[in-house]
């Protein structure tokens, strides 16, 4: 076990939108260390969003993340030979992490041909409270509500 917790590294704001959230999205979408490709995907998706909606893409992206953020999640706790799914509140940092993860995973699962279009459409859907990533948040909240009886097992 390590002696003390590793300190969080602060990400730099991206050069175009000056947003740390966009940098985190780029890092999340990046595969095999190909940052250039990841940046191209994000920025092209933002161009598509601007084209389709006529609004600022960064505002729509922030709104989408806000709509995806979960407030509760389930953690498995083993008590007396039984596993309980205990609902716990989610920290702000983890809310954003989960929102980005779900947004990108559900964008990858979409049926469009290119990742830029998939991502753009998922962001637009999420900003309108639709799409797979928002459904994932709703399902998580429903499960937490169903397991509310085990909330006293929190740690």
From Swiss-Prot:
It comes from the Bacteria. The keyword Zinc does not apply. The keyword rRNA-binding applies. One of its GO terms (molecular function) is structural constituent of ribosome. GO terms for biological process: translation. Keywords: Ribonucleoprotein, Ribosomal protein, RNA-binding, rRNA-binding, tRNA-binding. One of its GO terms (cellular component) is small ribosomal subunit. One of the primary rRNA binding proteins, it binds directly to 16S rRNA where it nucleates assembly of the head domain of the 30S subunit. Is located at the subunit interface close to the decoding center, probably blocks exit of the E-site tRNA. Part of the 30S ribosomal subunit. Contacts proteins S9 and S11. Belongs to the universal ribosomal protein uS7 family. HAMAP family: Ribosomal_uS7_B. This is Small ribosomal subunit protein uS7.
């Amino acid at each position: 076990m390590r002696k003390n917790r590793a300190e969080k590294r602060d990400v730099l704001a991206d050069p175009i939108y000056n947003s740390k959230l966009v940098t985190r999205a780029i890092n999340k979408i990046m595969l095999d260390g190909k940052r250039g490709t990841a940046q191209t995907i994000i920025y092209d998706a933002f161009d598509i969003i601007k084209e389709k909606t006529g609004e600022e893409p960064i505002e729509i992206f922030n709104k989408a993340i806000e709509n995806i953020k979960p407030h509760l999640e389930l953690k498995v706790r083993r008590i007396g030979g039984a596993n309980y799914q205990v609902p716990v509140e989610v920290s702000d940092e983890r809310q954003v992490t989960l929102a980005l993860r779900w947004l990108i995973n559900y964008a990858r699962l979409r049926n469009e041909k290119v990742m830029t279009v998939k991502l753009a459409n998922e962001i637009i859907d999420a900003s309108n409270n639709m799409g797979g990533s928002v459904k994932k948040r709703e399902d998580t909240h429903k499960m937490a509500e169903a397991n509310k009886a085990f909330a006293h097992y929190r740690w």
